[in-house]
From Swiss-Prot:
Residues binding ATP, per UniProt: 212-219
Position of the Glycyl lysine isopeptide (Lys-Gly) (interchain with G-Cter in ubiquitin) cross-link: 235, 279, 416
Main location: cytoplasm
Name of the protein in question: 26S proteasome regulatory subunit 6A homolog
InterPro entries: 26S_Proteasome_ATPase (IPR050221), AAA+_ATPase (IPR003593), AAA_lid_3 (IPR041569), ATPase_AAA_core (IPR003959), ATPase_AAA_CS (IPR003960), NA-bd_OB-fold (IPR012340), P-loop_NTPase (IPR027417), Prot_ATP_ID_OB_2nd (IPR032501)
Positions where Phosphoserine occurs in the chain: 19
Superkingdom assignment: Eukaryota
Length: 424
């Protein structure tokens, strides 16, 4: 389509030139030469302006580099204001305040030297990216904001983040299939398949309480959950939140949840929560009141105005009977998962899990060993496997046989208060 039009245009110009006289052609040529000369002068002037602008930019960058020399003064954004200068301001006077005529956002900040500064010119940071509470680095003399700084957290909270993911798997846990399913439904599925809950219109639980006798696999289950999800894992211990100074424990809880929001999706695991979650009572001792304040801060973070659905809490305890009812109610730790003593079938499975990397004789009967370990928990069954291996090592054997396991049961049972019948 375009080729015939080009041919028509060129033929029209040829016809026009053919109809023009020689003087007209010379005049048109001079006009074109003048236009070309003017355009060349404009291009040359534009290039010179570009060079001068580049020089100015380079000078300004050098000045900025000089002004941005470390160290900075640290400050906090207190308030962000919108400047609207009056329209009827005097324009012909000599004493016009230029700062009062500026439009845009201004900042009130508080420095680490306890000075409150109003900045009509923000500095080198985009004002739209700032919000109250942000930590910024400012110039020591002009107080202009030079850079934004990362949020400040307690160093103890930063140490709670588990950088190396645990290596445990659900296959390392024996006899707790029902508990694994409940934990996956409450913690893992809302993070990996959130759309399934939205389709049903169901709000997933905020937290899970794992309770049961010692050695039944509560902490092991939390470690396996951390290994199976891509979420950040924060591990807190209940005694770690009990601090000497007033308000210190509550600040740790607050900083932990704030860090979890920035790292979301995140799982917070609080082991031995009975250290801070005991029932409240009237006490004149300041230490007891401080523990209660720490628990109240935990309750506020669980269901306060600042709660976040991308943060899940797993709490573990072996004394669920002494926990405060406010902590146990629905909406906070919604799902309670009990970890009972393992059954006979579960004990056989646990013994097989802990001995799968050992060189075990084929004649070892794990079902018979499970019948001999009535009332043993998971930790004691692991101790049985370790003792059996040590006994085989003591007699220079290359395999662990059934008698070694029986001797291991005897040694572990001797350390228990209750007497057990270890023969089937």
């Amino acid at each position: 389509m375009a080729t015939p039009m080009v041919e028509d245009t060129s033929s029209f110009e040829e016809d026009q030139l053919a109809s023009m006289s020689t003087e007209d052609i010379v005049r048109a040529t001079r006009l074109l030469e003048n236009e070309i000369r003017i355009l060349k002068e404009d291009a040359q002037r534009t290039n010179l302006e570009c060079d001068s602008y580049k020089e100015k930019i380079k000078e300004n960058q050098e000045k900025i580099k000089l002004n941005k020399q470390l160290p900075y003064l640290v400050g906090n954004i207190v308030e962000i204001l919108e400047m609207n200068p009056e329209d009827d301001a005097e324009e012909d006077g000599a004493n016009i305040d230029l700062d009062s005529q500026r439009k845009g956002k201004c900042v009130v900040l508080k420095t680490s030297t306890r000075q409150t500064i109003f900045l009509p010119v923000v500095g080198l940071v985009d004002p739209d990216s700032l919000k109250p509470g942000d930590l910024v680095g400012v110039n020591k003399d002009s107080y202009l904001i030079l850079d934004t700084l990362p949020s400040e957290y307690d160093s103890r909270v930063k140490a709670m983040e588990v950088d190396e993911k645990p290596t445990e798997d659900y296959n390392d846990i024996g006899g707790l299939e029902k508990q694994i399913q409940e934990l996956v439904e409450a913690i893992v599925l809302p993070m990996t398949h959130k759309e399934r809950f939205e389709k049903l219109g169901v709000r997933p639980p905020k937290g899970v309480l794992l309770y049961g006798p010692p050695g039944t696999g509560k902490t092991l289950m939390a470690r396996a959950c951390a290994a199976q999800t891509n979420a950040t894992f924060l591990k807190l211990a209940g005694p770690q939140l009990v601090q000497m100074f007033i308000g210190d424990g509550a600040k740790l809880v607050r900083d932990a949840f704030q860090l979890a929001k920035e790292k979301a999706p995140c799982i917070i695991f609080i082991d031995e929560i009975d250290a801070i979650g005991t029932k409240r009572f009237d006490s004149e001792v300041s230490g007891d009141r401080e523990v209660q304040r720490t628990m109240l801060e935990l309750l506020n973070q669980l269901d306060g105005f600042s709660s976040d659905e991308r943060i899940k809490v797993i709490a573990a305890t072996n004394r669920a009977d002494i926990l405060d009812p406010a902590l146990m109610r629905s909406g906070r730790l919604d799902r309670k998962i009990e970890f009972p003593h393992p059954t006979e079938e579960a004990r056989a499975r646990i013994l097989q899990i802990h001995s799968r990397k050992m060189n075990v004789h084929p004649d070892v009967n794990f079902e018979e060993l499970a019948r001999s370990t009535d009332d043993f928990n998971g930790a004691q069954l692991k101790a049985v496997c370790v003792e059996a291996g040590m006994l085989a090592l003591r007699r220079d054997a290359t395999e662990v046989n059934h008698e070694d396991f029986n001797e291991g049961i005897i040694q572990v049972q001797a350390k228990k208060k209750a007497s057990l019948n270890y023969y089937a």
